[in-house]
Regions:
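Short, Lys/Arg-enriched N-terminal segments with co-localized hydrophobic residues
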Residues: 9-21
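Cationic, low-complexity basic patches in intrinsically disordered or flexible, solvent-exposed regions
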Residues: 3-4
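Short active-site oxyanion
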Residues: 57-61, 85, 174, 234-235, ...
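Short, structured coil segments at secondary-structure junctions
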Residues: 78, 83, 91, 195-197, ...
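Conserved acidic, metal-coordinating active-site core of Asp-based
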Residues: 116, 120, 124-239
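Asp-based phosphoryl-transfer active-site loop
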Residues: 25-38
Length: 290
């Protein structure tokens, strides 16, 4: 297990050689709880620093469980279309090239699992099950307060359908089960046992259960992307705070946990930066990228 180091202990800025600074060519960022603060905003100093490192030739990647409509506005704020950045949406099930809008990788759930998963989920009290079109969130049971949190984060309307599986006539990158944490804690292992080898099922937040195509997580898709670019994991810094960031933090040459990260994420990281409300990403840039 990697041993985390606090920002106060590991004062690296004046210790890194120029060669070490140039080692890292890629910066990959989770969004909620990492790039954005508690107001879901990118602070001006962090935005300026991220644009600066792109101008200097670094590749910026945004990697999120959000749908593409929830990622793209932040990519535009960071001017990623100018500098060759990439967006990993749906926890890596879709990779989009910012400069062209081209989808260069896309994985969908097997359609025949949608109805049985839906039927299992609907037996749980108070939960919802949702997926996404390009413009809206589709609710299969009826929105709960966690559904509305997801809608607010992504600025998307919610439409409830009477027959969720029948309504999904298009490729589905992921389904999300919003619900009370204690309900999801019981549901998750049940679904994992039923769909072992078919689906990737995990919680991104205590109140969000992600249902993904087999083997899809942020690390898997980053590996595909880096390989296509002729780069390695050792050349990448990954920053995150949640359960769904674990794979990429363990995969990266430098895995960084936010001070506000889940405990298991901090335990897996090489370095712990400041919180998302204290410009933690700016701190990483100052220490390791300039």
């Amino acid at each position: 297990m990697k041993q985390p180091a606090s920002a106060d202990i590991r004062k690296r800025q004046n210790l890194l050689t120029q060669e070490e600074h140039m080692k890292y060519q890629v910066l990959t960022l989770d969004l909620d709880g990492t790039l954005t603060n508690s107001k879901k905003e990118i602070t001006p100093p962090t935005r300026e620093a991220l644009i600066d490192i792109q101008k200097a030739g670094r590749i910026l990647i945004l990697a999120s469980g959000r749908p593409i409509n929830g990622v793209a506005p932040l990519a535009r704020k960071l001017e990623m279309e100018k500098y060759g950045g990439y967006m990993l949406s749906f926890n890596g099930a879709r990779i989009t090239k910012c400069s062209t809008g081209e989808v260069i990788y896309n994985r969908a759930l097997p359609h025949d699992v949608i109805r049985p998963v839906f039927e299992e989920v609907r037996t749980c009290p108070g939960v919802d099950i949702i997926t996404y079109t390009d413009s809206e969130i589709i609710s299969g049971i009826g929105p709960n307060r966690y559904t509305m949190i997801e809608a607010g984060i992504n600025k998307m309307a919610v439409r409830t359908v009477s027959d969720f599986p029948a309504a999904l006539t298009f490729p589905i990158n992921k389904m999300l089960v919003p619900g009370d944490p204690e309900i999801l804690e019981e549901l998750m292992p049940r679904l994992q046992n039923q769909y072992h080898g078919l689906l990737n099922i995990y919680r991104s937040e205590p109140h969000f259960l992600e249902i993904m195509p087999r083997n899809i997580d942020k690390a898997y898709s980053l590996h595909r992307l880096l390989s296509s670019l002729g780069l390695s994991a050792e050349q990448m810094i990954c920053c995150g705070d949640g359960y769904n960031d674990l794979s990429m933090i363990e995969y990266a040459g430098l895995g960084v946990a936010m001070a506000n990260a889940q405990t298991v994420v901090k335990e897996s990281a090489d370095f712990i930066t400041r919180s998302n409300d204290d410009d933690g990403i700016l701190h990483v840039i100052d220490l390791f990228l300039r």
